[in-house]
Amino acid sequence: MEPLYQAGSILMTVNTLQGKKMIESGLQSGDFSLSQSWPSCLPPPADLEILQQKVAGVQRELEDFKKEALKSIHYLEDAFCEMNGALVQQEEQAARVRQRLREEEDRGIVRNKVLTFLLPREKQLREHCKRLEDLLLDRGRDALRATKKSQAD
């Protein structure tokens, strides 16, 4: 997009000595009106009109830019709010997951303690059962021998 105006220089001839004299005489007399030579420093009315139009165009562009900037800021604020809401949800979900992990860890610790307690007991019970089986088998053999012996007699 081309700018509505072109940067250029406006040349003005300034007679500082004359300006100083104007100020001094104005201060002394209380007259702050411009001298007759002042209008010669202003650009011609046609150029002034063009400059005013360009300034008005730039002001419109500035207002449009402000509106677009505000619209973008509102859009970014909305997006930030959405992202913040999503972040809060994810943090809540992460907290729930951490809680579940802690609970599972606690259950695992309890399971390990139970297994640590039960495994030696299981071994003891197996050994005891084996001894009882052996006793029963020995008694059964003894009873069988006694029966055979009594039958043989």
UniProtKB/Swiss-Prot annotation:
Q: Supply the alphabetized keyword list.
A: Coiled coil
**In the UniProt record, does the keyword Disulfide bond occur?**
no
- Where, if anywhere, are coiled coils annotated? 46-109
Listed InterPro entries: DUF4715
> Which GO BP annotation is one of this protein's?
female gonad development
Q: Which domain of life is it from?
A: Eukaryota
Q: What is this protein called?
A: Coiled-coil domain-containing protein 182
Name the gene behind this protein: CCDC182
